[in-house]
Amino acid sequence: MITYHPETNVLEAARQRISYIFDNFERIIVSISGGKDSTVLAHLALVEAHKRGRKIGLFYLDEEVVYQATIEQVEYLMSLYPENTMRYWFQIEFNLTNSVSLTDGQVHCWDPAKKPLWMHKRSKANILAAPWSHKTVIADKNKGFGYYDVITNFEMNMPGTAHLVGLRAVESPNRFRAVTRNPGYKDIMWSTKAPCGGVSFYPLYDWNYMDIWKYIGDNNIRYHRYYDFCALKGVHPAQMRVSSLTHEKAYRSIASLPEFEPETYEKLLKRIKGVSFAQETAKNKKMFLAQKLPKGHSSWREYRDFLLKTYPDKDKLPIFIRRFRHHLDNEFVARQQCRQLVLNDYENDLPVKNTEDPIIQKINFWRDVL
């Protein structure tokens, strides 16, 4: 049980949490993405490791189709305290959701057949093949060996490990409620159980947006260049994402990619089909945003049925059909289903809010009143 003084701020609390983890676990691994939250968490953990003369792992799953600035940021974190860092930079083959192509539902990262088109080079200093000795576990054969499968197998290969993740409650309340339903370690509610006796901890769970940037500024830490670009463009903080360029929550970044990193955009054009179309329509309300019905369609339900009928990846189609069977049949839900389909969101990273149509509810309310 960790107790805090009433005047303890979030930074002091996070340091106490990380110290507690160091006291109770021999092996600690921090997941990093190049984003601001994992940058702060990695720095806090590395400072504690340096103070104790211990080593911790930094885990980065390289999705290949990423900003060059992301690679630079990850290299920066890996080199901050080299004497205290174990490098778990994975550059292995796996499947990734592809929301920018209407024909290819997945990107096969580090595909040997596409080596001349790889977005950036692999390094001998990184992990280039699956390091685990157990039989590889794949959650869904239809999806193949995917992003989360890599993480699961890595955690299975690291029994009894403390995995630190930069999840913040204010950024993803629904996800945080899901992971904090039951304590993963003793009575620590900001933790969840991981495979093989491991535990995932979220030491920054109560930090807000300004806490993150204050820590970065106070400690003069380098951060991803994309944040400055977005700030100058007036992008809302919630839309500043540095994940893969084909992710269903980051596809709009492609609209500005030619301006931010023109060389990366040129490589992406050659690597993935449909990028040019996605770049032109990323902010189109009729396409990826699914905010307006395209011409020729009279309702969202009719448009959804059309998309299901013409969905190009027949292996992934049953995933959507099974999921949609559990949804209500109204226009509000159907519009969200259309968005999942046009973004190839078979992973359900943009879950449908399965409720009654609020417009119909409002109409019925006023009918009763009047």
Regions found by a protein language model. Name each.
Residues 1-31, 36-370:
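Nucleotide-activated chemistry modules centered on ATP-dependent adenylation/adenylyltransferase
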